Each structure stands twice: as C-alpha cells, then as structure tokens.
From Swiss-Prot:
This is Serine/arginine-rich splicing factor SR45a. Residues 30-45, 54-68, 177-195, 202-219, 329-343, 364-382 have a biased composition (Low complexity). Component of the spliceosome. Homodimer. Interacts with PRP38, SCL28, SR45, RNU1 and U2AF35B. It comes from the Eukaryota. Belongs to the splicing factor SR family. SR45 subfamily. Phosphorylated. The gene is SR45A. PROSITE patterns: RRM (PS50102). Induction: Up-regulated early after high-light irradiation, but not by paraquat or high salt. Pfam families: RRM_1.
Length: 382
C-alpha cells in the first residue's frame, strides 16, 4: 500500500501527516481525503435529477425553435396600432387588397369585448404576406396608423382559463369595473350610520355637543326626584322593542340609573318631545293596548307590576294609569317652562285634591260657625 511518515517542523512545531500512495502523486490531508471518499464520482439523486433536467432542456431547445419556425411558415402577420372600434371584418377587407386572407384573429378585451389594439392575420402564401408588409405597413385604418410585421406565432396565445382581473395597480389591487372604491366607502358609511341608529344616538341632534348631560324633560325630572322606583315609564315600555337598552343584559348593567342613555338622548330630541306630549294629552285605547302587550317575560322582570313595588310607588302602576285617566283634569305647566304636559302625577293630584278638600272643609266650617253665631246673637237680642 503506502508508507506513513511523520515530519516535525522546527518553526511551528506542528505535526504534519503525509499520505503517499503509489497510484497517486498528490499529497492530500485527511479532511480532503474524507471529502473525496464521501462524494463518489457518481452523482447524488439531486444531481441526477438536475443533470437530467439540464440535459432535457438542452436537448429540447433546438426542437422548440424548430417547432416555432414550423408554426409560423411566414404567412402570419402581426398587426398593431388598431383602433378599439375595429372589427375582424374591417381587417379582412383592408388586407384583402394585397392577397387572399385565410384567418383573422383580433385580440379582444374580456370585459368590454373591444379590440385591445393588435391582432394576427394569416395570408394564403408567403408572397402575399411579404406584399402586405411592404404596402400596408404604416397605412391608415379608421384614422389610426397601423404597423404590419412578420409574426413570431401563427396566432395569439390561448387565453389562460380563469377570470381576467385587469391591470395590477401600485397597491396590489386589480383595476376592473367590478371594483369601485367609492362604492365601498358608501357601503361602509351606510353600515356605520345604521349601526349608530340602532344604538339610538342618531335620534338626538345634540348628542355630540352635550354628551351625557341631564335631561331637559320635566317628566324625567319628576321621575328622577319624586319616584323611588326604577321601572320604565309607559312610553319607555312602548319603545323597548326598538331599543337595545331594555334587553336583560343591559337592564342588569344599568339598574343603578333610573333611565338609560338612549332615553336621555331621545328625550332631548324635539321629535320625541312632541310624541310624548301628544301621548300624555290623550290616553287612547290603542295606546293602552300597546302598553299591555308587553311579553310576560318583561312583565315578570318589571318591578312596577310586583305588589311590593306597587305599595312603594303608585305613580307608574296600572292603577295610577286608571287614576290618571279618570281624575286628571286640569293642565299644568312644567317648572322649566320648556314643554307643556296636561298629565298630572297621581301623587301631586292627590295632594292637590286633599288640599282642596281641606280648604273646602275649612270654608264650610267657618260658614257654619258664622251662621251659628248669627243665630245665637239673634236669639239673645230682645
């Protein structure tokens, strides 16, 4: 085989191994030998595939060029600069002056079905094609100067199956008639407006300026200061089907307040003030029917229907509505003077009726005492 020799260098004092073989004249290190032995002259599977693909491409490239030349024998013409209104019939008539036309292929836009400005024309012979190039190049067709040259292909490529999305813009979107940024903005605006109207804020014109300020309605002022109950009014029960704040979830969250934000927002709007005034002046049977058509679920949750709270607060119970309908006669002006309401709260009406009855009793007692005195004085006088 070979001999192993160890040489000591005096300068660096490093050990150097030299492998000598009778068949090889080169001295190689163990690392290079291992690399050499690891990678055999035979190619790896990756190199095999790579070499096979390279050989295929090299072997097929001349046949491809030959096939392309065979595909266009020389009678196919490439025409550019066409008008968008030109048709295949116009092209055929224009090139029929110089020879016989066998095929016309006009490339159209898939959306508008108009000409994209170029096409392919096949003549019967190569002589006719050369004649068309000499005479019709830079000619005028429908007001446009066209260019005629020899085509690389017989006709245009077959369009890729799928949907044509148009040209790509800088933002990565495709320009097509189906996409409209103005339309998307309007959709988002309408969604945002509908969402805000569902929440009840768009009903109040002064919501953004005043925020969560106190209510301007005397009805809510009386309810806020005189009513210990937290049950909604008949008007709020009527609107509970349109307002999300009266769902069980929002009722649990807003029990600490006497009324919800939507009620305050609607209370400031003149539209709802007019509706409330009209309803408070006339208690129609239709409104009472709507008021009584509350679901049993909400009626069970509403505290105004429980007997315990009827004893505490009689101002919004069904009995008080009956009392208000039959016994509230006189109109009263609100303390702020901003809105009029002819409905008097039952407690206030009862207090006024009691005070009137007391005054009447006092006046009658005083009249009776005066009449008694006058009678006694008449009887005593001679």
């Amino acid at each position: 085989m070979g001999k192993r020799e160890i040489h000591f260098t005096p300068v660096g004092r490093q050990v150097q191994r030299v492998l000598e073989y009778p068949l090889r004249l080169e001295n190689r290190s163990p690392m290079s030998y291992s690399r050499r032995s690891r990678y055999s002259p035979s190619l790896s599977p990756y190199d095999k595939r790579r070499g096979r693909s390279v050989s295929r491409s090299l072997s097929r490239s001349p046949t491809r060029s030959v096939s392309s030349d065979a595909e266009n024998p020389g009678n196919s013409l490439y025409v550019t600069g066409l008008s968008h209104r030109v048709t295949e019939r116009d092209l055929e008539d224009h090139f029929a002056k110089e020879g016989k036309v066998t095929d016309v292929h006009l490339v159209l836009d898939p959306w508008t079905r108009e000409s994209r400005g170029f096409g392919f024309i096949s003549m019967k012979s190569v002589g006719d094609a050369n004649r068309c190039i000499r005479s019709l190049d830079h000619s005028v067709l429908q007001g446009r100067v066209i260019t005629v040259e020899k085509a690389r292909r017989r006709r245009g490529r077959t369009p890729t199956p799928g949907k044509y999305l148009g040209l790509r813009t800088a933002r990565g979107r495709h320009k097509s008639p189906s996409y409209s940024p103005r339309r998307s903005v309007s959709c988002s605006r309408s969604r945002s407006r509908s969402y805000s109207s569902d929440r009840g804020r768009s009903y109040s014109p002064s919501y953004g300026r005043r925020g969560r300020s106190s209510s301007y309605s005397p009805f809510y002022r009386r309810r806020r200061f005189y009513s210990p109950s937290r049950s909604p009014s008949p008007d709020d029960r009527y609107n509970r089907r349109r307002d999300r704040s009266y769902s069980p979830y929002y009722r649990r969250r807003d029990r600490s307040r006497s009324y919800s934000r939507n009620c305050r927002a609607r209370d400031r709007s003149p539209y709802y003030m007019r509706r409330y005034r009209s309803r408070s002046r006339s208690y129609s049977p239709r409104y009472r029917a709507r008021d009584r058509s509350c679901s049993p679920y909400y009626r069970g949750r509403d505290r105004s229907y429980s007997p315990h709270y009827q004893g505490r607060d009689r101002s919004y119970s069904p009995e008080s509505r009956y009392y208000r309908r039959h016994r509230s006669v006189s109109g009263s002006v609100s303390p702020g003077g901003r809105s009029m309401s002819r409905s008097i709260s039952p407690r206030k009406g009862r207090k006024e009726s009691r005070s009137k009855s007391r005054r009447h009793d006092r006046q009658s007692s005083m009249c009776h005492s005066r009449s008694a005195r006058s009678s006694t004085s008449r009887s005593v006088s001679p």
